[in-house]
């Protein structure tokens, strides 16, 4: 148990301590992002979560202001439009009344803020209206002599006016046309109780304007209740890349909403364009993250169906205003959910992907992704690990040269939406894993491969007479091939070479399982590699190009190694190469990200670079 814990701890240290060197680059266009987001919306329950009742209080705080920038500044003399915060404030003086507000007929708003009621009994006589109430009223006649003139003080009424129009019998006095008992203000008059504009009249309190006033349908959002989103169509997604920032996301959808109003049930259909500015960042763990900076909803094509009654146009306006307030709080969270799914997809890149039964491949981000006007570029460091062991470092042993830096990628084609570039270093790491696991080592015996000539001392003796002299009776041979150093991968324009330096030990199998070595040969081979894709894997197929032999040791004396070139080449072509291709047959896993499909990708071999375009 202690040993297992130590191995696990060392593996973690190895992963954390590995330098972030780019050996794989992925480029995607905005279309890939759009398709990925559309697919996630279709598969997830993000839309279903929005089908709910609008909670009370939603709409008082715009999503894109209070959730991002904080509350707006407070204006001391600014009044709220119909009691709901809007972007624009109404700048008013302190002594102005509000349309449909608190003030009723017969009331005066004093300069200090109090309300004076002119309808009580104390104002029904001329005496109270002018002289008798002089001590309480704010207006008074200016005392002045016959031959003297002076300036009027604030609040004074000229004497002629005070005793004329405002006096008893005057226009505004008791009994006058405009007095409390007159045609306009008297009981039953135009402005009186029960009159056209009076309290209880058609346009007064309780009438049409009462509906519009304090507590009326237009004073608060509560004029519409029971709002519930009942249907949300699958959004049409569009993405615009913002160089150096991230993306500008747009979700166009149709929303069906039910609700109630004072004049009937509402069926609301509205077209909504949810727009969000999204910044691409990288968190502390090294994963890229898409984060909303701002979210807005643009409404259009609002249709309201209701039992037609009073003021349908005013109800339409109210619906427009209410939806503009409440929909951001309900629909912008959908963007949060979708981006969370995209971030989860980006995190899947870091998961271990099996490389057959021998090891695994892990793609990690080596730097902050690059956003241009044409594509999003993800720099990846691909780690190849042994099954239950450590990571494969490239190069390891031979060839003892430093890995080349990641070459510059070619421009993306007009019809290319995804581009994956893999360096020769990464492909070499995959072959190194096979070498370390001894997957390339092979023992070949007589009769194992029908295509080969008989592997006996008689066959070898025909080439090397000293073998026939030493083994006059035919004995079976064993050809033991070992790859002691990691293979190397060389990528050139339209050509990929895999170099394998192996040893071939020729042994005689004798009775009682005795094995005697005849010679040890260094075999320097070159294979032409071809690439294809199958599902989410890169397939590699090798074909023998040439072999070069060098005699290292011999127990039958020196001989011309060139005599064995034909036989050894056949052994590597008909036995070693199929065995190596069988091991490579499991394929190299490609990064699983954003639902990119490379199954029909075009593959180009460039200098030190393998490029897949889909």
Curated annotation (Swiss-Prot):
Principal location: secreted
Disulfide topology: 295-332
Gene3D superfamilies: Bactericidal permeability-increasing protein, domain 1, Bactericidal permeability-increasing protein, domain 2
InterPro entries: Bactericidal_perm-incr_a/b_dom, BPI_fold-BPI/LBP, Lipid-bd_serum_glycop_C, Lipid-bd_serum_glycop_N
Record's keyword annotation contains Disulfide bond: yes
SMART domains: BPI1 (SM00328), BPI2 (SM00329)
Similarity remark: Belongs to the BPI/LBP/Plunc superfamily. BPI/LBP family.
The protein's name in its UniProt record: BPI fold-containing family B member 4
Upper taxonomic lineage: Eukaryota, Metazoa, Chordata, Craniata, Vertebrata
Gene name in the database record: BPIFB4
């Amino acid at each position: 148990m202690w040993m297992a814990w130590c191995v696990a701890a060392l593996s973690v240290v190895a992963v954390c301590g590995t330098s972030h060197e780019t050996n794989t680059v992925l480029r995607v266009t905005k279309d890939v992002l759009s398709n990925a987001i559309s697919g996630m919306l279709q598969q997830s329950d993000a839309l279903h979560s929005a089908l709910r009742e609008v909670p009370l209080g939603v709409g008082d705080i715009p999503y894109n202001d209070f959730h991002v920038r904080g509350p707006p500044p407070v204006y001391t003399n600014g009044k709220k439009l119909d009691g709901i915060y809007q972007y624009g404030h109404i700048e008013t003086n302190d002594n102005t009344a509000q349309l449909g507000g608190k003030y009723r007929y017969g009331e005066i708003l004093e300069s200090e803020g109090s309300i004076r009621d002119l309808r009580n009994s104390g104002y029904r006589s001329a005496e109270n209206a002018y002289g008798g109430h002089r001590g309480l009223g704010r207006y008074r006649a200016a005392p002045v002599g016959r031959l003297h003139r002076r300036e009027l003080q604030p609040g004074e009424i000229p004497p002629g006016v005070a005793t004329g129009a405002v006096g008893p019998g005057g226009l505004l006095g008791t009994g006058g046309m405009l007095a409390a008992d007159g045609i306009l203000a008297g009981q039953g008059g135009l402005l009186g109780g029960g009159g056209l504009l009076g309290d209880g009249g058609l346009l007064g309190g309780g009438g049409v304007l009462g509906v519009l006033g304090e507590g009326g349908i237009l004073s608060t959002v509560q004029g519409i209740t029971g709002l519930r989103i009942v249907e949300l169509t699958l959004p049409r997604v569009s993405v615009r890349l913002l160089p150096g920032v991230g993306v500008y996301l747009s979700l166009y959808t149709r929303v069906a909403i039910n609700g109630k109003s004072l004049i009937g049930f509402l069926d609301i259909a509205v077209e909504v364009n949810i727009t969000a500015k999204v910044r691409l960042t990288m968190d502390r763990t090294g994963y890229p993250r898409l984060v909303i900076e701002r979210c807005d909803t643009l409404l259009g094509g609002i249709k309201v169906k209701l039992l037609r009654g009073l003021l349908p146009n005013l109800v339409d306006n109210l619906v427009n205003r209410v939806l503009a307030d409440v929909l951001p709080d309900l629909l912008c969270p959908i963007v949060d959910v979708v981006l969370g799914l995209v971030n989860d997809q980006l995190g899947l890149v870091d998961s271990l992907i099996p490389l057959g039964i021998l090891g695994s491949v892990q793609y990690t981000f080596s730097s902050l992704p690059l956003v241009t006007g044409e594509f999003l570029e993800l720099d990846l460091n691909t780690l190849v690990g042994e099954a239950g062991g450590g990571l494969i470092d490239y190069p390891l042993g031979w060839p003892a040269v430093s890995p080349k830096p990641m070459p510059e990628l070619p421009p993306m084609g007009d019809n290319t939406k995804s581009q994956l570039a893999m360096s020769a270093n990464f492909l070499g790491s995959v072959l190194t894993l096979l070498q370390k696991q001894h997957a390339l080592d092979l023992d070949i015996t007589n009769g194992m491969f029908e295509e080969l000539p008989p592997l006996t001392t008689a066959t070898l003796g025909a080439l090397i007479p000293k073998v026939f002299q030493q083994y006059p009776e035919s004995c079976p041979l064993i050809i033991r091939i070992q790859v002691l150093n990691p293979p190397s991968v060389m990528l050139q324009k339209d050509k990929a070479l895999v170099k394998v330096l192996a040893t071939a030990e020729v042994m005689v199998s004798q009775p009682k399982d005795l094995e005697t070595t005849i010679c040890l040969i260094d075999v320097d081979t070159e294979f032409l590699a071809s690439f294809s894709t199958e599902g989410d894997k890169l397939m590699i197929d090798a074909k023998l190009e040439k072999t070069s032999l060098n005699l290292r040791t011999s127990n039958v004396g020196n001989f011309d190694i060139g005599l064995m070139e034909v036989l050894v080449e056949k052994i590597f072509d008909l036995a070693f190469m199929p065995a190596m291709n069988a091991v490579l047959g499991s394929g190299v896993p490609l990064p699983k990200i954003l639902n990119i499909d490379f199954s029909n990708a075009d593959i180009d071999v460039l200098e030190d670079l393998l490029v897949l375009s889909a």
